[in-house]
From Swiss-Prot:
The keyword Magnesium does not apply. This is N-acetyl-gamma-glutamyl-phosphate reductase. Gene3D superfamilies: Dihydrodipicolinate Reductase, domain 2, NAD(P)-binding Rossmann-like Domain. It comes from the Bacteria. SMART domains: Semialdhyde_dh. InterPro entries: AGPR_AS, AGPR_type-1, NAD(P)-bd_dom_sf, NAGSA_dehydrogenase, Semialdehyde_DH_NAD-bd. Coiled coil: none annotated. Belongs to the NAGSA dehydrogenase family. Type 1 subfamily. The gene is argC. It catalyses: N-acetyl-L-glutamate 5-semialdehyde + phosphate + NADP(+) = N-acetyl-L-glutamyl 5-phosphate + NADPH + H(+). It comes from Rippkaea orientalis (strain PCC 8801 / RF-1). One of its GO terms (molecular function) is N-acetyl-gamma-glutamyl-phosphate reductase activity. GO terms for biological process: L-arginine biosynthetic process.
């Protein structure tokens, strides 16, 4: 495909870590060209002023957010905005013929009352929200292919659901016993100035936050309920760890059949994800490490059973900025456009 045939795409909210990760991926994607970078606080600045390491590749200036301009230039728009802003823009962009991928929480929920309860914003875009597809390709690949609006999952839900989904879909566990212990690097908190993300605060320290009230909880529960066929509640506790990238999610649950052994579960997981090119099921006795996924769109999954407690333990590792954010959005873009799912997405990590 020649340069003139590339699909023009735009990013509104390009100044954050998710935005710059999108820029990196789209620059190397053979089917797209970046036609617009937009923002509010950074409007008027050359993009290389925000990220000098891209000065030799990106000559664009961050522009004020003007949806008429965006729609006139772009067939596809990524929204990398704080929660509560995309829902004001997506309906207009879709009405103008754009495909939209939202990286915030605005279009992740089927029930907008749940969104309002957890994100404290009333919504009037019910019709648009009803068209949104949850952007986890391993579960909703077919729906994504025909969608015009994608609600890209959060980083914690991605890692957690990749670990939990086969257990729930196949009825292998007692759903009410599911516990998720997840740990994330500091880039998940964004690029804004936050005291707890300062090196002096985060280095050498490990702590939980959002205990019993993290906003990703209802998102996880919505998909778990879909898979189980009835309402499911999970115990989810996130932790901040002193590294930049990565999420390790450890899921514990009681087996419905205590006689089920690890090798049986490994076989079930391998079959469940057999058509998922980014999921790597590890052999028994090998457990995932976040470093393996750095800079890639991969998800590594390790499995163990504990016959003493009749529980299964599933661990998943992803790069929170890739499979947990920008990489997964590009994966969804590929499916929406009918391209190879892996197109433009790295599968080789930074190592060591």
């Amino acid at each position: 495909m020649g340069e003139s045939e590339r699909i023009p795409v735009g990013i509104i909210g390009a100044s954050g870590y998710g935005g710059v990760q999108l820029v990196r991926l789209l620059l190397e994607h053979p089917q797209v060209e970046i036609a617009y970078l937009g923002g509010k606080g950074s409007a008027g600045k050359p993009y290389w002023d925000l990220y000098p390491h891209l000065s030799h590749l990106v000559n664009l200036t961050v522009e004020p957010i003007d949806l008429e301009v965006v729609a006139s230039r772009c067939q596809v728009v990524f929204l990398g905005l704080p929660n509560g802003l995309a829902c004001d823009m997506a309906p207009q962009l879709i009405a103008k013929g754009c495909k939209v991928l939202d990286l915030s929480a605005d279009y992740r929920f089927r029930d907008l009352q749940t969104y309002t309860a957890w994100y404290n914003k009333d919504r009037s875009d019910t019709e648009t929200a009803a068209k949104a597809v949850y952007g986890l390709p391993e579960l909703y690949r077919t729906e994504i292919q025909s969608a015009s609006l994608i609600g890209c999952p959060g980083c914690y839900p991605t890692a957690s659901l990749m670990a939990l989904s086969p257990l729930l879909k196949q009825g292998l566990i007692l759903p009410e016993t599911a516990i998720i212990d997840a740990k994330s690097g500091t880039s998940g908190g964004g690029r804004q100035e936050k005291i707890h993300l300062l090196l002096a605060e985060a280095e050498g320290s490990l702590g939980a936050y959002g205990v019993a009230k993290h906003r990703h909880t209802p998102e996880i529960e919505q998909v778990c309920s879909d898979l189980a066929g009835h309402e499911v509640k999970v115990q989810f506790t996130p932790h901040l760890i002193p590294m930049v990238r990565g999420i390790l999610s450890t899921v514990y649950a009681s087996l419905r059949d205590p006689g089920l052994v690890r090798d049986d579960i490994l076989t079930i997981y391998s079959a469940f994800y057999r058509s998922s090119p980014f999921v790597k099921i590890l052999p028994h006795g090998i457990y995932p490490q976040t470093k393996w996924a750095w800079g890639t769109n991969l998800c590594y999954i390790g499995i163990e059973t504990d016959p003493r407690t009749d529980r299964v333990i599933v661990l998943s590792a992803i790069d929170n900025l890739m499979k947990g954010q920008a990489g997964q959005a590009v994966q969804c873009l590929n499916l929406m456009m009918g391209w190879e799912e892996t197109l433009g997405l790295p599968q080789l990590s930074f190592y060591p």
